[in-house]
């Protein structure tokens, strides 16, 4: 039975754009060559790392969703370790609850604002009321 997985890779952000693009292409090609089906590829882009990893202080983040029966994960993560452009990676199973939550967000949009978010608007209204007296 195939499950839905998400892998996040962090490529060294100090590399040239063409090297980063080639690394992402190589990873997606590797996933398909291992018998998995790539669903989505999301390039998040460059972000400052919370702490240096080796000499890298900037990382290029990529999220890839794919379906697999789980047999390819060991080889996939071995290839991540061998690729010097990839400085970090994480692969997780997307469970049913997370997928349902994503569908709800897509269907209904962003969650409603809380009362804390609207507190500044209420203060402005009170100030306007006082000035009109």
Curated annotation (Swiss-Prot):
Family that this chain belongs to: Belongs to the bacterial ribosomal protein bS6 family.
An annotated GO BP: translation
Function per UniProt: Binds together with bS18 to 16S ribosomal RNA.
Cited HAMAP family: Ribosomal_bS6
Disordered: annotated span: 109-133
Superkingdom in the source lineage: Bacteria
GO molecular function: small ribosomal subunit rRNA binding; structural constituent of ribosome
Gene3D superfamilies registered for this protein in UniProt: 3.30.70.60
GO cellular component terms given for this protein: cytoplasm; ribonucleoprotein complex; ribosome
InterPro entries: Ribosomal_bS6, Ribosomal_bS6_sf, Ribosomal_S6_plastid/chlpt, Transl_elong_EF1B/ribsomal_bS6
NCBIfam families listed in its UniProt record: S6
Name recorded for this polypeptide: Small ribosomal subunit protein bS6
Keywords, alphabetical: Ribonucleoprotein, Ribosomal protein, RNA-binding, rRNA-binding
